[in-house]
């Protein structure tokens, strides 16, 4: 402190101004620090307390906390009443949309909307649902529907996915196995099948009993059963109809018989491959509550047979397949695959073939082997034996007069045609080619193509002559035909293929194989060009025997030719002229015991083991 403190000469006022501590707080007296520092203050508060309802306050706070949690949980699902005020002010203004409406309604909201009957309604829910017309998202932008209509659309029984899920769940509950485990899927309702699995939900017991009698008239086999659950009943049918029916037809039939909506029906064809589906129907058929009609399908019998599922029975033998294709004379891969697959119901080896993972390679190899066997067998036959076999393969009755009448109509002496046919069949040099020449529609192709069909010959197309392999079919046939030869074709023969017309050995190139040398088979040609009348084909005239068809072939009013020749007609033709054609009689005198003793076998299994 300064020496002159308090002695400014102004009396005691200077002391007060100097020693005073300035503070602008008026609440310092009430400071809790100063109150606590006071030792004279009483620690007991004797002020009057205002009584309150603490329990009600606690409940209110708990309720608000719960509502906040529910609101956070449902914030994405609450409907907004935003358009209600606009609709009250101006309905026309409410119809105006700047942004396009959503295509699909928010399906997740339905969960909370439909559950509102049992759920606790929050004040926000009450505020939303108490609006005059809750908003509904629609594509057309029209006014929203009522709350009751919204609930009806949700709880509608015919709801597609909902009803199907309920029926599948009920089916699995009652029958243990799922409906998809015993059936396969047909995507189209138009696909025909004679076997169907039908599950009907909610059919009455009286109609179920009557339906068995009605459906048994349409089916060769029918198995029916009905089970009841607290959530509904389920009727199950395995129907094998007398004729194939589509799902649409079966649905209409069952819906009319059971008086059940189509939405409460499940229809799919049964799984016919697999042990589990077969055991399901077999076990269900043993139940006394199951009604059956007719004979059990073969696929159930076979797959529930112990011997049918043994390892030895399911072993595939390639030789058996080749033997089957050889016996049926099948040389096309598509026919071998299709026809052998159809035998899987009765042939165990065919069933094992379907279970194989390399069917394409097996079919290709089988086709190749059959072609090798048939080609070697055909080449080992004489022309007489070959024609005899073709006659045996021809079916039906025919008349050789249809061929003779066509020749006479064209002014050809039948005896001249037969005399030319005799060396042609034997492939005698200089007599190896016969040409039928004449104007269009004179029956040239009719005569030649029917003869090729009977003899199993090949047809060559000159359009492929630019390829080195266009003559490759000559290696697999006994006779051949070139239809409608033009000047280009005759010039090509005159330049390159004179020895083919002669009937001498030729070398033929084959694709992906080495060239083969063989005797040229007898050749038939049809043409509008007479090589004997043109000097530039002088070197072909001695190699070609020509017959002229000068008259147009008559036809009926419908355009059908009056001359009609079949394989049976050619069969009768060769049988009647067998000796005239100088064909040997060895086929009539052949040792029948040798032929009947054993046919050609290309399977490793013995004859008794083959199916």
From Swiss-Prot:
The keyword Isomerase applies. It comes from the Viruses. It is found in: Host nucleus. ATP binds at residues 438-445. The modification Phosphoserine is found at residues 80, 84, 90. Pfam families: PPV_E1_C, PPV_E1_DBD, PPV_E1_N. GO terms for cellular component: host cell nucleus. One of its GO terms (molecular function) is DNA helicase activity. Residues 412-562 form the SF3 helicase domain. It catalyses: Couples ATP hydrolysis with the unwinding of duplex DNA by translocating in the 3'-5' direction; ATP + H2O = ADP + phosphate + H(+). There is a cross-link at residue 519 (Glycyl lysine isopeptide (Lys-Gly) (interchain with G-Cter in SUMO)). Residues 112-154 are annotated as: Disordered. InterPro entries: Helicase_SF3_DNA-vir, P-loop_NTPase, PPV_DNA_helicase_E1_C, PPV_DNA_helicase_E1_N, PPV_E1_DBD, PPV_E1_DBD_sf, Rep_E1_papillomaV, Znf_lg_T-Ag_D1_dom_sf. A motif (Nuclear localization signal) lies at residues 74-76. The keyword Ligase does not apply. Residues 135-146 have a biased composition (Low complexity). A motif (Nuclear export signal) lies at residues 89-98. Its EC number is 5.6.2.4. Keywords: ATP-binding, DNA replication, DNA-binding, Early protein, Helicase, Host nucleus, Hydrolase, Isomerase, Isopeptide bond, Nucleotide-binding, Phosphoprotein, Ubl conjugation. Residues 112-128 have a biased composition (Basic and acidic residues). Residues 146-313 are annotated as: DNA-binding region. Phosphorylated. Sumoylated. HAMAP family: PPV_E1. Can form hexamers. Interacts with E2 protein; this interaction increases E1 DNA binding specificity. Interacts with host DNA polymerase subunit POLA2. Interacts with host single stranded DNA-binding protein RPA1. Interacts with host TOP1; this interaction stimulates the enzymatic activity of TOP1. Belongs to the papillomaviridae E1 protein family. This is Replication protein E1.
